[in-house]
Every structure is written in C-alpha cells, then in structure tokens.
Amino acid sequence: MTNILDILACPLCSGKLSCDGGSLKCALGHTFDISKSGYVNLLPPGKGKNSHTGDERDMVKARADFLSRGYYNRLDTRTAEIISDMPQDEMTLVDMGAGEGWHTLKTTSELISRSKKMLSVGFDASKYASECGMKKSRVAGLSEKNPYDMTSRASLVFIPANIFSLPIVNDCADVCLSMFAPIPWDEAYRVLKKSHDSMLLVLSSGKNHLIELRSLIYDSVNISDSLPEVPDGNDSFVSAGTTELCYTAHLENSEDIKNLFTMTPFYYKTTEEGKKRLYSQNELDVTVDVNYTIFKLK
C-alpha cells in the first residue's frame, strides 16, 4: 500500500520529503513541523493568499457539528458507490478542498468497507480544518500518531495546502475529488495517473439545493442548474456524464439550521433581516440536490 511520503513533495522546491523526528524535510533543508494533531502545514508563504481562502474556526465548527448529525451521509455513500466501481483494488484519493474532513473520512471508510485499500489525502487552505480532520481520522482509526513514518499504514491524512499548487508528485492519484469547491483543473491533471481508469469526480449544487433555506433568507431566489464544464482551452479532460442525488432532510432544531447556514456561502451575503427570518425557525425541511459529474482523461 502507498505511504503518504511516497507522494508528498516540498511545496517550496518540489523535492522529496522525508520524516526526521517531528518534522518533514527535503534535501535542500526546507523543514515542516508535524503538529500535535498530526498535520503538517505545507501552505507556503504567499501561495495561500488568494481569493479562495480557507475556512476559519467558526465555519469549521459549524460544518463539523452539522455534518456529524448525518444529514449529508447519503452524499458520501453515493460518492463511494461511484468510486468503488473503479477497477483498482488499491487507490490513492486526493480531495482538493476537503474542509474539516467529514466527507473525505466517510467516503474513505465506505470504500475500505467495500474492500478497497485506500490512501486518502485531504487538502485545504485552512489549518483549523486540517486539524479537525486529523483528529477525526485518528479517532476513526484511519491515521496514526505519526502518519509520516515510512512504516505507517495510515489511510487518511489531512494537510493544509494550496489546492492550486498541491505539494504532491505528478501522476500519483487514481481519483481527484472536488466537493463544492473551486476546481483546480491543471493540478488535477498533473497529479492524476495517466490512465483511462483515473477520474476527477466533481460534486456541485443542483438547482433546488437548499431551496427552502434560500427562500427564507432572500426575497427572490435565483434557480439555476449550472453543471461544471471543462474550461475553454483545456484539452486534458472530457465529461463522462452526470448523475443527480436529491432527497429531503429534516433539520430537527434551530442549532442545526444555523450550523447549515453558517457553512454555506450565503452566510456572508445575507441581510440581517434574512438571518432573522431563518433563525426564527425551530425545524426545517430542506432539499439536498447534488450533481455528480465524472471527468476522465482524454
């Protein structure tokens, strides 16, 4: 099984990283400390300062609290179903924008239960999110105290990094996963193994996703079903089709409603009046509408 050090690369020089006590080092001496929770911050100065910043503590906590309630578990089951159809018995999964790690963890656990041997790496610009993910991974038995030791058999690691400049080697991933995040097309192509079996799986919001919540916070709701498309000029990927998952989730209390709202992009664009209408709800049925689009290498 692939070890995490087999695929990691120095974010400053792209050299191979090795474990030296409580740090990772490359041949040029660039050093990255391993935190107590087990993550290594591979987000280099300057490269993390872009328009796609990482989640802060309040959003990370809201996501962790909401997702632990199980409302979105069906998303991860469907994700695992799609990936499990791939022929590889052993695979490396790269989650590009993993957040606090819930979806990566649930998907990885599901794939292992389907007899896949997994190495999953969740990248996110937020060190808070990666810390949360590493703690969950350890509790679930998918990681170890030092997952970067060459004897480690960790199945799931979370690392703060810029998803548009991933600190991993070329041609190392069987699956790249992008869930409700900006899609780094060039990086996905670079890190995917150049095989017809490799896959970029993109999850995006369907036209009715959270329509009930949006109707409460906005005076008028824009309903659109915008599927991800390969950018003009990109000749690396071709769409292999889209499937939809749509169901109703019953949010049982006001805390769950607020946590869901806090973890959405609507949180920063809603008026105080809109928030007041939403926060007055003690329970709420919401539509979960998600598109799964598979992209294959040309």
Protein language model regions, located:
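Conserved class I S-adenosyl-L-methionine
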Residues: 199-229
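Class I SAM-dependent methyltransferase SAM/SAH-binding core
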Residues: 92-95, 100-165
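Class I SAM-dependent methyltransferase Rossmann-like catalytic core
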Residues: 49, 54-78
